[in-house]
Design a protein with these regions (language model features):
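Di-metal (Zn2+ and/or Mg2+/Mn2+) metal-binding site signature of metallo-dependent hydrolases
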Residues: 3-25
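Active-site-adjacent C-terminal substructures of enzyme catalytic domains
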Residues: 196-264
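Active-site gating loops and adjacent loop-to-helix segments of metal-dependent hydrolytic enzymes
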Residues: 20-54, 111-112, 173-200, 220-223
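A structural motif
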Residues: 70, 99, 162, 221-222
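Metal-coordinating catalytic core of metallo-dependent amide/deamination hydrolases
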Residues: 77-207
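Divalent metal-coordination and catalytic microenvironments
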Residues: 2, 13, 69, 94, ...
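Alpha-helical scaffold segments that flank or form the walls of functional sites
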Residues: 3-5, 24-76, 81-99, 121-131
Length: 264
């Protein structure tokens, strides 16, 4: 009595390996800006992952999802020192849980060309391999901030037909500043130039989009995931969700690796 019966929740942007960040102390002074959080917490964390820790990162997130009625998760994975087969490890854990997931590997230039290409191959391999009714695949990109034009072109050429991308966009001002410095274009303009956008692509965050970027997302049918708890935790700003909805953007809810209690 007094409770709702609802369909299962869908978490449209998560990081299973975020399970290891809970309560983790960051050495030295507290980061003042989001780029420092990446450099002092998230990038050292993902570099520390091996096959065993990848598996154990997924298990508490999946248990938490079951507990809170979240039945489908769209994960964005990175483990630059354990790339090959990493999506299979996550896929096995998802199948054991009985939940559903869409998986991808984060391609980035920040660990060098060899690992960028290894991440590309892992995405393509998993896209072509996945046959499970509980699993699907997309092609992961970190962000415009850590991808050159050459790398974006390689990813666009490599992705099989009918699939889209999963990419962080304008989570912090630094992503927009970097894109303007690289290309004289804002993040969404740059991604559109490389044919990254479209109805099968998910852009995460969009905190610092301008009106033109919102218009492009709406026109291309690209998805936008909103992570309010993460945005508040990282102090990156408040996404203009009402403006996005009025513009006709397809907005969905993610947790960025926080709890799968999607409505809290």
């Amino acid at each position: 009595r007094g409770q709702f019966v609802m369909p299962g929740n869908i978490c449209a942007h998560t990081h299973f390996y975020g399970a290891f960040s809970r309560g983790m102390a960051i050495p030295g002074p507290a980061p003042k800006e989001f780029p420092e959080i990446l450099q002092k917490l998230w990038w050292p964390l993902d570099r520390s992952l091996d096959a065993e820790s990848i598996q154990y990162s997924a298990l508490p997130c999946l248990a938490d999802a079951i507990r809170h009625g979240t039945t489908t998760l769209i994960d964005h994975h990175a483990s630059p020192n354990a790339i090959d087969g990493s999506l299979d490890i996550l896929g096995d854990a998802v199948e054991q849980s009985g939940l559903r997931a869409v998986l991808c590997y984060e391609v980035t230039d920040r660990d060098g060309e060899e690992k960028m290409k290894a991440g590309l191959r892992e995405n393509v391999r998993f896209i072509k391999k996945t046959k499970s009714p509980l699993l699907a695949a997309t092609f992961g990109l970190h962000a415009s901030l850590t991808l050159s034009d050459a790398s974006l072109d390689l990813c666009r050429q490599a992705i099989p037909n009918g699939f889209g991308f999963h990419v962080h966009t304008a989570e912090h001002e630094s992503d927009e500043y970097d894109s303007l410095n690289k290309s004289n274009m804002r993040v969404i303009d740059r991604l559109q130039k490389h044919n990254i956008l479209g109805p099968n692509t998910i852009t995460a965050h969009g905190v610092h989009f301008d009106a033109r970027e919102m218009e492009i997302l709406a026109d291309t049918g690209t998805w936008l995931t909103h992570q309010p708890r993460s945005n508040m935790n990282n102090g990156v700003g408040v996404a203009q969700i009402e403006s996005m909805l009025r513009a006709g953007i397809k907005v969905c809810l993610g947790n960025d690796g926080f709890s799968n209690a999607m409505w809290e």
